[in-house]
Amino acid sequence: MSPRPDIARQRPDILCIGSVLWDVIGRAPRRMALGHDVPGRITRLPGGVAMNIAAACLREGMRPALLTVLGRDSEGRALADACAAMGLNTDHVTWADDLPTDRYMAIEAENGLVAAVADAHSLEAAGDRILAPLSDGALARADRPWTGRVALDGNLTLALLEQIAASPLFATADLRVAPASPGKAGRLLPLLGHARATIYVNRVEAGLICETLFDSAEAAARELVDRGARRVLVTDGSAPVAEAAADGAFHVARPPTVSVCRVTGAGDTFMASHIAAEARGEQGAAALEEALAATALYVSSA
């Protein structure tokens, strides 16, 4: 679905809070291992967990707004222009004179992600400054909190996620939460038991949160619910995806078989597509199937 050009001027129906940065991705059409130096293609495009979720929501016809920080530098201005050209709402971005625009660098090959480094230090340094639109009246305020959907990404600091978990500003929001990477999965612990949170993780991230090795998404999803999660969705690459909830609901779906051309942003696309499917009224296995189909299309397109 192509985004309408006026969509950024409409009131948002989902807030994407977290990293918006430049993705620098090197891709090689062969298998790679540590130390390999091979020919390929290097691209730069807008990225970051919050950005990827917003872009996928936009493709699904939703109206996302970005809450993040950008440096008031040439890279930040170019990134904001690129987001606006896509149709994303950047009205509530925090601009920083003292911080550079964040970046992410990854190497992908035929055998998947080889290595990646995320430099999200400016987002971490900005802290709760990026949440100002939720209390100053721009989007909401303390006596009229945001009641819509919110996508939170694990690039936010543990302290800020703890603050969000306890904040009345988010008490009535539909929270959707994803770690930025396995290394940051532990940051989601403050939100694990939140009464309005849905957690999206992969099998490895679930294992790090639970300090357990899981052999399937199904086992990981059940354990996360046993540990207090209200609802959780666990992916596992090409293996089945599982959804479990504290009310006993449990669903499993298998991803379509496709040739994988890219992996960066796949988890974010799954999360956004699932949110969009539920916004359209789909539930349970039907919403999972729609999200998996959208993700398969994403990873199989260059």
Name what the model sees in each region:
Residues 72-73, 155-159, 179-184:
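Short beta->alpha connector loops
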Residues 2-14, 38, 185, 217-302:
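Conserved phosphate-binding/catalytic region of the ribokinase-like
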Residues 22, 34-36, 44, 59-148:
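Conserved N-terminal subdomain of the carbohydrate kinase-like
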Residues 57, 202, 267:
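Short, conserved phosphate/pyrophosphate- and ester-handling motifs at nucleotide-, phospho-/glycolipid
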Residues 58, 169, 279:
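Gly/Ala-rich phosphate-binding loop of Rossmann-like dinucleotide-binding domains
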Residues 13-15, 148-149, 174, 198:
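Structural motif
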Residues 1-69, 74-88, 253, 259-260, ...:
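Glycine-rich phosphate/adenosyl-contacting loop at the front of the ribokinase-like
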Residues 165, 169-250:
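Conserved phosphate/ATP/ADP-binding segment of small-molecule kinases
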